[in-house]
Each structure stands twice: as structure tokens, then as C-alpha cells.
Swiss-Prot record:
This is a cyclic peptide. Belongs to the cyclotide family. Moebius subfamily. The presence of a 'disulfide through disulfide knot' structurally defines this protein as a knottin. This is Cyclotide cter-N. InterPro entries: Cyclotide, Cyclotide_moebius_CS, Cyclotide_sf. Probably participates in a plant defense mechanism.
Length: 29
């Protein structure tokens, strides 16, 4: 959805479910 997941990401990897890496942070889909 674009809400911040509370996680930064490196190499495009997010560990929070249903989140994707965007501009070095994880956003909910």
C-alpha cells in the first residue's frame, strides 16, 4: 500500500511479510 514497514532494506530484501524494497526502505504492498 505505501505504508512504511519499519524496516530498511539492503539489496532489495525485506523480511517483513507483504513488504517490498523501495528507496532503501520497506513499504507495504
Amino acid at each position: 500500500g505505501s505504508a512504511f514497514c519499519g524496516e530498511t532494506c539492503v539489496l532489495g530484501t525485506c523480511y517483513t511479510p507483504d513488504c517490498s524494497c523501495t528507496a532503501l526502505v520497506c513499504l507495504k504492498n
